[in-house]
Swiss-Prot record:
UniProt KW keywords: Cytoplasm, Endonuclease, Hydrolase, Metal-binding, Nuclease, Ribosome biogenesis, rRNA processing, Zinc
Signal peptide: none
Primary location class: cytoplasm
Alphabetical list of PANTHER family matching this protein: ENDORIBONUCLEASE YBEY, CHLOROPLASTIC
Protein name per its UniProtKB record: Endoribonuclease YbeY
Localization per record: Cytoplasm
Coiled coil regions in record: none
EC class (word): hydrolase
GO molecular function, one term: RNA endonuclease activity
Note accompanying the cofactor annotation: Binds 1 zinc ion.
Membrane-traversing stretches: none
InterPro entries, A to Z: MetalPrtase_cat_dom_sf_prd (IPR023091), YbeY (IPR002036)
Record: residues binding Zn(2+): 109, 113, 119
Length: 143
C-alpha cells in the first residue's frame, strides 16, 4: 500500500495518473512482498529543510528516503520517500527526459534505499543501478 501526501499542487497539475503510476512502481520494487510506504510530493523549500536537518546539507535534493521501524511511525509502514517537484523538473529538462520517467526513476531510487540498497561504493552503486534498470524495464512492459 502507498500513502501519498501532496504538499505542492503542481504535482497533480503535471500528472493526472499519479496514484496509479507510483503504486505500480512500488509493486515492482517489492516483487510480490507486502509493505506499506509513504510518499511526500513536495517542493525545493520543504526538501531543503529536511536535507539540512537530517543530512547536514543546506541545499535542495531530488529525493530523500527514510527507513522506519514499526515503533517510529506505525505498524506496517516501513519507509517514506520524499520527492521535490522543482528538482525533478530541472533535472528532466537538463537531461532531456520526460518528467514522468524521471519521477519514476527517482521514486524507485528512494524505495530501493529503504529496502537496503545504497551507493556508497562502486559495487553498491552498480547493484543499485542494475536493480533500478530492471524495475524500469518491467514498468515499461507493464505500461
Amino acid at each position: 500500500m502507498l500513502e501519498i501526501r501532496i504538499t505542492d499542487p503542481r504535482w497533480t497539475k503535471k500528472l493526472k495518473n499519479l496514484d496509479a503510476l507510483l503504486q505500480k512502481a512500488l509493486e515492482c520494487c517489492l516483487e510480490g512482498k507486502k509493505a506499506e510506504f509513504s510518499v511526500v510530493l513536495t517542493d525545493d523549500e520543504f526538501i531543503r529543510t529536511l536535507n539540512k536537518s537530517y543530512r547536514g546539507r543546506d541545499t535542495p535534493t531530488n529525493v530523500l528516503s527514510f527507513n522506519y521501524t514499526n515503533e517510529q511511525i506505525g505498524i506496517g509502514i516501513i519507509g517514506e520517500v520524499i520527492l521535490s517537484f522543482d528538482r525533478l523538473v530541472i533535472e528532466a529538462l537538463e537531461n532531456e527526459i520526460k518528467f514522468e520517467d524521471h519521477l519514476l526513476h527517482m521514486f524507485i531510487h528512494g524505495v530501493l534505499h529503504v529496502l537496503g540498497y545504497d551507493h556508497s561504493s562502486d559495487r553498491e552503486t552498480l547493484a543499485m543501478e542494475k536493480k533500478e534498470e530492471e524495475i524500469l524495464k518491467k514498468l515499461a512492459l507493464l505500461g
